[in-house]
């Protein structure tokens, strides 16, 4: 029987991955992490199909433990990935288990290729960024690009509902507030700052207009190469509550001015505040991907793909690609080998099929 180990399987994202994988009774699913009690609690919730194991991602015997458990696929959900090294991925290669993570940290995802030779040597796939970015975002661009002879710009983003994400996710996305980041603009790299350059983006109902600002994601580095000769790649994100977005923007200026070193140490307090305000906010989230360029007759063309999520189902979306890829690996349906960012491994339909039953809808418009 094939076996999937979900590292961090009792966290916000990990639990969702476990729940989805455990629905297939033909494979073993192991909830893993440092806290065995929490792992057992999640495994017990599954009603029998999941097991629990104590695993420390920093342990020197991690590879041996994965081998002992019989892992075929490891899904690493224990973020934040900003500042992490590849110790888990290396252990998976040594244990001869495929590796999938939900990282959206730019340096982490873009650097995963350093493990390519080792992964190929052991006939494995090591895929980083099986999340909203770059897995879903690149799948959308791949789907839309068939209408274009040339893509000149890619502008995409995400706006979340009032339900706050987990602590690790907040630490990751607020860690670069006010910090410089490189953005591809008009065929040259320019410096912008995290959570600044606020833009008002109008989304279809039920979302409406939202403020979004600069975020540092792998797409900013990967897309200029993958979709060359694209001249501009921009990614922005935001939250539903205007006061929260403007507060983040204001705090980013304190970091940029050197009055604060980072917002990371303030995240617990910020999250507690967000939890108190949650009931006053929207339950709707959205993602958009806008391509502009030329069609086959060299005429200007623009297309926008929208993903609209209601009833607090938006936080499920970052897990969909990892679940889809893990399921395909467990079924032996993925031929790709090597270490790479998660692009070109899944289609939009394959990713969204995992979200069947959620309050999600998509549409494409010509702007």
Regions found by a protein language model. Give the residues of each.
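Residues in the short beta-alpha loop(s) of Rossmann-like NAD(P)-binding domains
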Residues: 10, 33-36
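A generic structural motif
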Residues: 24-29, 33
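NAD(P)H-binding glycine-rich loop region in Rossmannoid oxidoreductase-like domains
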Residues: 28, 38-111
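C-terminal active-site/capping subdomain that shapes the small-molecule cofactor and substrate pocket
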Residues: 257-367
